Every structure is written in C-alpha cells, then in structure tokens.
A protein has these predicted regions:
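Catalytic nucleotidyl-transfer cores of nucleotide-processing enzymes
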Residues: 1-61, 74-77, 81, 85-91
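Acidic, low-complexity N-terminal propeptides/linkers enriched in Ser/Thr/Asp/Gly that mediate export
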Residues: 1, 9, 60-187
C-alpha cells in the first residue's frame, strides 16, 4: 500500500488486506493461499481503523489519545467470547455470581480505576493476538474461579481497581499501569 486515498495506513499484526480503508488495500485474490497470509483482525487493528480511520482531522492530542487507546472493540473476539460465556455459564455460588456480574458490567476499557478489568483479564487471559483466541467452555470457568481466589488473597476483594492489580515494579518503583493485552495501549 502506497499513498492511500484515505491518508491512513497501519500495521497491528493483522490482515495486510485491511491495512488502510477502501479500494487501496491489496487484493487477497492476487495472493495464493500457500503463502499462508493470516487474515484475522486483532483488537488493536480494529481500534486503529475505528479511531484513526474515521477521523478526517486528527489533532496532535487526538493522535496521542488514539495511540494510547485502552478499549476493546465491540467486534473483537474477546468480546464475543465474553458474551457467549455469560450466556452459557451458570454461577455455582454467590462469589461466582458477583464475578460474572463484574464481567457483564465491564465497559471494555482498561483504565486504572476500572473495577471489572482484573476479573475479565484473569478469567479470559487475552494475549497479544486475541484474534486467535479460542472459546473454551471448561477453561474460562476454571480461570474465573482461580481469579476469584487470587484477587481475594492478594487484594481482599474480587473487584480491585485495574491499577491495583496491573503494576510496573522495578526496585523501589511501583506504579499502576492502564492498558492491557491487544489494546493500542498494549501492556
């Protein structure tokens, strides 16, 4: 892709056939399947396209806000797995019911003060390429139970803020970190 008419190009470890907007993307039909070109879309790619790709006038502040976006796209695979999990899994006790309510109420953001992000992250354990993440009806409930125990043990509650859980610790320096796996503010 060179000099696309959309004046927008990105690479977020996802489909090269969606590197820009519109007609300027490479045509997948021109590339044989044996090349093994992956076509999945990462959350970072979805968010970059949604933010940078739809804003006709990006200010300097917009650029930094978009670059450090801390949100999951509604169409990301992680959100699809969460929706399915909430439909299929029944809580076994009051703690699991509370954990599932945290997951249900999550706003898809990984801000420091968010009280649902830790439960979501520890239950689903998204990695850098959530586009490859597979739904696992046995693993996710088990990981939710582990998350409940770990959060209670380390934070005396199952809904600590994300900043209490996600930390950068180097020697005497101990700082909260916003962001997460496969968001533009990747951690």
């Amino acid at each position: 892709v060179e000099d696309p008419s959309a004046a927008f190009i990105h690479s977020c470890n996802s489909s090269p056939f969606k590197a820009t907007l519109g007609e300027d993307n490479p045509d997948p039909k021109k590339y044989p399947a044996y090349l093994g070109i992956e076509t999945f879309m990462t959350n970072r790619s979805r968010r970059a396209r949604a933010l940078f790709g739809t804003d006709p006038e990006i200010s300097r502040q917009d650029f930094f806000d978009y670059k450090f976006d801390k949100e999951y796209d509604p169409a990301s695979r992680l959100i699809g797995h969460i929706d399915r999990f909430l439909q299929e899994i029944e809580p076994e006790n009051a703690e699991q019911k509370q954990a599932m309510e945290l997951i249900r109420s999550w706003d898809r953001k990984t801000d420091l003060e968010n009280r649902s992000t830790a439960m979501v992250t520890l239950t689903f354990r998204p990695r850098s390429q959530t586009g490859k993440m597979r739904y696992d009806k046995d693993r996710f409930p088990r990981q939710m139970k582990e998350a409940i125990q770990m959060l209670k043990q380390r934070h005396s509650r199952i809904d600590p803020t994300w900043g209490e859980v996600n930390r950068l610790v180097r020697g005497k320096v101990d700082l909260p970190l916003a962001g997460g796996h496969d968001v533009l503010r990747a951690i």
